[in-house]
């Protein structure tokens, strides 16, 4: 199996659940978007996936997207899966989609081309149950971007915990955003979890805020023994 991997909570938790089910993950597949506006792929601090790959002790294959075109994103994903299929003889792709039929259909069409299975461990999972499970399973998750009404600079750089999850739930009810952030309302990076052999520590970062949305730009991370 290969796992579409962005380093955020969804792809990492899907990887975790796949391994819990006894699936062997041979490689991580990471696409580097041309723009933060990508409909298919996560972009903030995507370079850190190489360190997360080391923490997981799973090899990573990357490919860079050169435009904002959906067709270009699709073609670059096709190239990535073709490479994984050739090099690792994969039989399936794990992805972290929860409710996006658009995303799932795009991924599924490529899987059908290579006759491999699309595995979606989070599909249709209740948002609160999912977010709570992340904490129950000792995932250390930092919020690295916000871009929705109700989410301000207070959340940028914070580590998800039970207290701020309750606050996020109330705000999601009030402002109507997805608690799981699947619509891009916020982005995350996983710093530690049970399948990491090492944990990540952020050494340097900077917050940017334009009045409506913001990002934590991480410039230095290192790996620590657990």
Language model features with spans:
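Nucleotide-activated chemistry modules centered on ATP-dependent adenylation/adenylyltransferase
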Residues: 1-226
């Amino acid at each position: 199996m290969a796992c579409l991997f962005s380093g955020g909570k969804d792809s990492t938790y899907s990887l975790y659940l796949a391994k819990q089910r006894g699936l062997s993950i041979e490689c991580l597949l990471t696409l580097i978007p041309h723009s933060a506006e990508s409909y298919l792929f996560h972009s903030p601090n995507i370079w850190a996936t190489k360190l997360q790959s080391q923490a997981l002790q799973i090899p990573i294959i990357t490919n860079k997207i050169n435009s904002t075109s959906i067709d270009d994103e699709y073609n670059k994903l096709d190239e990535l899966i073709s490479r994984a299929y050739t090099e690792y003889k994969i039989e399936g792709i794990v992805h972290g989609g929860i409710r996006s039929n658009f995303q799932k259909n795009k991924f599924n069409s490529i899987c059908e081309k290579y006759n491999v299975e699309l595995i979606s461990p989070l599909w249709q999972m209740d948002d609160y149950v999912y977010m709570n499970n992340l904490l129950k399973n000792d995932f250390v998750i930092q919020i690295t971007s916000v871009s929705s009404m109700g989410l301000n600079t207070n959340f940028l750089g914070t580590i998800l915990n039970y207290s701020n999850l309750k606050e996020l739930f109330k705000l999601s009810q009030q402002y109507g955003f997805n608690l799981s952030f699947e619509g891009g309302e916020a982005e995350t990076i996983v710093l530690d979890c049970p399948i990491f052999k090492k944990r990540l520590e952020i050494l340097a970062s900077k917050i940017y805020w334009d009045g409506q949305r913001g990002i934590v730009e991480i410039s230095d991370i290192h790996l620590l023994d657990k």
